[in-house]
Every structure is written in C-alpha cells, then in structure tokens.
C-alpha cells in the first residue's frame, strides 16, 4: 500500500489519467474503434524529441552553454539576467522541463560558489516562469503545443499570433523584474577547466543529434511523415548510445495515451460530449486557464481541444495557464523538487514567492489576452 502511495505522489497526473481512462471503459466497452483514439503522430514526436534532447544533455551541451555565458557575467544582476534569458530561449527548443532540470541545479551551484545563496529563491522562481513562458513560443517548446499543433493542423501563422505577443510581453516583464533587483559585483570563480578542448571534441558528437532534431522539426511542419523519422531516430540512438532510451519519460507518453482513451470514449457519449462543448465553446481562454490550475496545462490541452472551436485562443490559454498554482505546469514541480532537495528548510519561502510572482505574471498576461483577443 505504501508503494502505491509513493508511486501516486511521484506520478499523480499519470495515475489520474489512468483512472479516468479505466472509468470511461466502463461506459464505452472496448472495441476496435479504440485503436483510432490515439494521435500516433504526437506520441511519436514526443518520443523522438525527448530522446534527441537527452542526447544533447548527455553530451553536456547545455552545461557548456551555461558556463560560457557565466564567464561573461561581472555582477549578480547580469548573471541573473543571463540565467533567466537562457531558460527563456532554451525552453523553445529543449522544452521547459528539460531546461529546468538542466539549469536550476547549475544556478544553485553557481550562487553557492559566489556565496549568494540568499538570491536563489526569487531567481529559481523567475527561471521557472521564464521556461514556462519561453516554451510557448514554438510548437516543440512544450507537450501541449506539440499536441495542439500536430493534431489540429493549425497554421504556423495562427500559432505565431496565438503565442508570440505574450512571449514578447513575458520577456520584457522578466528582464524588468530582474533588472530592478539590487546589484553587486561577484568574485572571479573558476567553475571548470578545459572548455575549449571540450568544444572541439563536442562538434562531431553533436552533429547526429542536430540532424535528428531537424528531421523532427520537418515532421512538426508536416514536410515528412512521422513513421520513417521515428524509425530513423531509434536506429541512430541504437547505434550511438542505447542508454538514451532510459531518459525518455514513458509515463508522459502513457499519460497522453490514457487521455486519448478517455477522450475517445467521452466523445462517444453524446450527453457528456454536448455538455462539454457548450461549456468550452466560446470560453476557451478562461476554460484553459482555470482547468490548468487544477489538472495542469498538458491534460487541460488534451481535454479541451476536443470541445473547443477557437483553437488559437485555447493555445494561448493553456500556455498562460501554466502560471498560477504549483501544479499548473508539471515543469514547475520539477523546479520545486530540485530546490527543496537542496534547501528543504526554505520550501515555504519558495512556495510563497512562486505563488506571488506567478499570480503577477498570470494577471498581466491574462489582461493582455483579454485585450488582444477582444474577449
């Protein structure tokens, strides 16, 4: 019983999605139509992107980038600006959760080395906000964007109009908040040596993963079919580093699969489907933001997409909905867990700062959404 409780605490969204899927199977008995429920293209892309990013991470690409930028910093303010900007822009390509897994521990290490740990709470919170909001700017920045873009056939122009204005506002807000903090010089710190030699050795090793990332992007833009790219990625990883298969978040894939099963069954129950359509249609902005606060933005995107008429507004909503509560974005939970592991005595301080700053950004960006969408 204890192991079940521990597993639920570790994978709450998967457990909830599994229970919903199983419950829906009691209402719609399993048949061959179940095979048509999943969006196999989205699942294949998620798998490919996770394994490609794991390849970059295993080669130390992101840590090397962080150290390179660190050497350019001369003050706490400048260092903080660089780290927040790094999280914002990296999340567009390597996703928000991988960005935080990579750079939050690096940030904590650096601020301990310069003897400024008291600055960490606000900076890690702002890095989390930056990763969540930066990831909204591209179709591959987070799972909800990937799903909504691949399953709906929305054009890149529509997608850009749905996210780029808010990403721009968010970047200005983030940099302003960091800039107004008290500044001070930081001492010279030697983090690691031999980076120039590492860069020379890194290039040939990283090229195959760059090529695989390019293939994934061509699938996102519907230039290539997903199945040949999936097989190509799997073959290259088998040849280069089979251990990367262990880096894939299979519970995220299973969570998507469970939600596809749940939603496929719900659509076959006219009474429930009609009610959800009436609740969501025309209210995509608030439905997406509010649902994200309770079930997090990835499940909210999968659930609401089936009943929404205005998909661009829903894309805006579930991305802004990643702000707010700690569970609104699963990437935020990653930051909290990483911080709490090193500073367990400051968990309450972190949660207070996290909630405060997230509400500020959510209110400002929601107001911008009301103005820009004319709601």
Predicted regions and their residues:
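Short helix-coil transition sites and intra-membrane helix breaks within transmembrane domains
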Residues: 54-60, 90-102, 134-142, 289-305, ...
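Interfacial loop-to-helix junctions that mark the boundaries of transmembrane helices
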Residues: 4-10, 32-42, 154-166, 197-202, ...
């Amino acid at each position: 019983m204890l192991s079940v409780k521990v597993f639920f605490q570790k994978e709450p969204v998967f457990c909830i999605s599994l229970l919903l899927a199983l419950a829906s199977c009691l209402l719609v008995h399993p048949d061959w139509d179940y095979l048509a429920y999943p969006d196999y293209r989205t699942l294949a892309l998620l798998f490919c992107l996770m394994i490609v990013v794991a390849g970059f991470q295993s080669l130390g690409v992101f840590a090397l980038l962080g150290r390179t930028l660190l050497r350019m910093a001369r003050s706490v303010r400048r260092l903080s600006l660089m780290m927040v900007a790094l999280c914002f822009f990296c999340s567009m390509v390597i996703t928000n959760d991988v960005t935080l897994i990579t750079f939050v521990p690096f940030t904590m290490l650096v601020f301990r080395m310069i003897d400024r740990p008291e600055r960490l709470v606000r900076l890690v919170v702002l890095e989390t906000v930056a990763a969540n909001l930066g990831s909204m700017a591209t179709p591959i920045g987070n799972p909800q964007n990937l799903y909504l873009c691949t399953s709906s056939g929305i054009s890149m122009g529509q997608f850009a109009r749905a996210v780029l204005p808010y990403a721009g506002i968010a970047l200005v807000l983030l940099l302003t908040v960091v800039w107004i903090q008290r500044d001070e010089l930081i001492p010279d710190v030697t983090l690691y040596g031999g980076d120039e030699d590492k860069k020379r050795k890194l290039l040939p090793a990283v090229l195959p993963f760059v090529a695989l990332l390019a293939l994934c992007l061509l699938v996102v833009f519907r230039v290539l079919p997903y199945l040949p790219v999936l097989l190509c990625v799997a073959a290259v990883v088998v040849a280069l580093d089979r251990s990367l298969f262990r880096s894939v978040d299979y519970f995220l894939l299973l969570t998507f699969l469970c939600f596809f099963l749940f939603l496929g069954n719900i659509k076959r129950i006219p009474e429930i489907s009609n009610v959800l359509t009436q609740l969501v249609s025309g209210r995509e902005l608030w439905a997406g933001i509010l649902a994200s606060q309770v079930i997090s933005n990835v499940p909210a995107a999968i659930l609401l997409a089936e009943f929404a008429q205005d998909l661009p507004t829903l894309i805006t909503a579930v991305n802004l909905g990643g702000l707010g509560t700690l569970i609104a974005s699963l990437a935020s939970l990653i930051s909290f867990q990483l911080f709490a592991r090193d500073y367990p005595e400051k968990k309450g301080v972190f949660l207070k700062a996290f909630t405060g700053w997230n509400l500020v950004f959510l209110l400002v960006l929601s107001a911008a959404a009301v103005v820009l969408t004319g709601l």
